[in-house]
């Protein structure tokens, strides 16, 4: 098991990033109007299930009610071809210190831009802001929404941080069997459900229809996939040089979209990754890779490393960060596909037609 990111006990004051990046990159990213690869092209990783569908996140009825998830995670990062690393992540497999005897875990991926300040600050503070919220744990949705907004506003108030720094935020909060995914930006969470890919978050890109409508309603414009010609994401924390003042209406939103599911024994693992992964790999391809890796060595850290390595081989042009969370101590079982017992036949007319075609070859 990979070592988890150390998280200090909750305190009343927010932690500010200690080190500031000296050479800040541009706050924008390459245009996102080019479709991401939706197939698994590597010959080393052929998918068990063709296509890259959204299978729906509802848990099937009649599952084993005695299932109790056991959390173990692994992560891997690489700055890729960029000069600096602006991604951050957090992995906490055991929340006993924070929530008592209940089973719980917390994970996050934060894809920074315009320097590492916003991503580093969010990593250090967002989990404790969730758990310090008055609605936690009775309403994790309200607590999580509040934590995203509070983190965003704290970035505006922190004088030691670069106001032009911003970050996407993707978090997974698990209490007992209930998992809440919160996303603001274009990082993505994908559930591996017996080999099937289930996307639990939506990529918030300016060209997405719903995001475009929201942006234009608030007076924003989109140029070549960029919000106001500056950012390739429609939602982010920070970026106060774009948002202006707190309380003002701005097309760049910090509000997360939420997806909540109840884990079952069919839910094997969760993949969380920044857009550097998903720009070059489909969700289904990633799920298939992780499942086959787990069946070989059952190590989520090595799975994360394999995904990052594959993305680099596919010429990803961004920082890469991947977190893989397993829900069982055991490796996924082999999927047995029953053979069909139906007999196939062909008519005499069809046989003659087939012979004619073959004779012409």
Swiss-Prot record:
Cofactor notes: Binds 2 magnesium or manganese ions per subunit.
The answer to keyword Manganese applying to this record is: yes
Q: Into which EC class is this enzyme placed?
A: hydrolase
What molecular functions are annotated in GO for this chain?
A: metal ion binding; protein serine/threonine phosphatase activity
Q: Name one Pfam family in it.
A: PP2C
- Can you state which reaction this protein catalyses? O-phospho-L-seryl-[protein] + H2O = L-seryl-[protein] + phosphate; O-phospho-L-threonyl-[protein] + H2O = L-threonyl-[protein] + phosphate
Positions of Mn(2+) 2 binding? 111, 275, 318
Provide the cofactor list for this protein. Answer: Mg(2+); Mn(2+)
Tell me which EC number(s) this protein carries.
3.1.3.16
Where Mn(2+) 1 binds, per the record, is at: 111-112
Entry keyword Protein biosynthesis: no
Domain PPM-type phosphatase positions: 72-327
- Give UniProt keywords alphabetically: Hydrolase, Magnesium, Manganese, Metal-binding, Protein phosphatase
Entry's family note:
Belongs to the PP2C family.
Kindly provide the name given to this protein in its UniProt entry: Probable protein phosphatase 2C 47
User: Which species is this record about?
Assistant: Arabidopsis thaliana
């Amino acid at each position: 098991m990979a070592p988890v990111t150390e998280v200090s006990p909750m305190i009343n004051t927010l932690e500010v990033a200690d080190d500031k990046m000296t050479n800040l990159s541009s706050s924008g990213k390459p245009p996102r109007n080019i479709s991401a690869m939706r197939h698994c092209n590597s010959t080393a990783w052929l998918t068990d299930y063709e296509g890259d569908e959204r299978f729906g996140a509802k848990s099937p009825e009649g599952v084993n009610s005695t299932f109790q998830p056991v959390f173990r995670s692994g992560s891997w990062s690489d700055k890729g071809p960029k000069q600096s690393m602006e991604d951050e992540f957090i992995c906490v497999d055991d929340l006993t210190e924070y929530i008592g005897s209940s089973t719980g875990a917390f994970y996050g991926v934060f894809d920074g831009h315009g320097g590492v300040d916003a991503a580093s600050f969010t990593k250090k503070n967002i989990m404790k802001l969730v758990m310090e919220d008055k609605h936690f744990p009775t309403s994790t949705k309200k607590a999580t929404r509040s934590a995203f907004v509070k983190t965003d506003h704290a970035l505006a108030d922190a004088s030691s941080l670069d106001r032009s720094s911003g970050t996407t935020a993707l978090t997974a909060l698990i209490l007992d069997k209930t998992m809440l995914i919160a996303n603001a930006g274009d990082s993505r969470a994908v559930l591996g459900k017996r080999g099937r890919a289930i996307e639990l978050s939506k990529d918030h890109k300016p060209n997405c229809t719903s995001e475009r409508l929201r942006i234009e309603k608030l007076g924003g414009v989109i140029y070549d996939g960029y919000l106001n010609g500056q950012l390739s994401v429609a939602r982010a924390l920070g970026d106060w040089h774009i948002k202006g003042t707190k309380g003002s209406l701005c097309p760049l939103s910090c509000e997360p979209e939420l997806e909540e599911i109840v884990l079952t024994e069919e839910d094997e693992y969760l993949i969380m990754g920044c857009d550097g992964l998903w720009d070059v790999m489909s969700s289904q391809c990633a799920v298939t890779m992780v499942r086959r890796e787990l069946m070989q060595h059952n190590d989520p850290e090595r799975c994360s490393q394999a995904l990052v390595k594959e993305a680099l081989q596919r010429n990803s042009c961004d920082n890469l960060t991947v977190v893989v969370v397993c829900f069982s101590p055991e490796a996924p079982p082999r999927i047995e596909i029953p053979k069909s017992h139906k007999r196939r036949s062909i008519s005499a007319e069809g046989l003659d037609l087939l012979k004619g075609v073959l004779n012409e070859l």
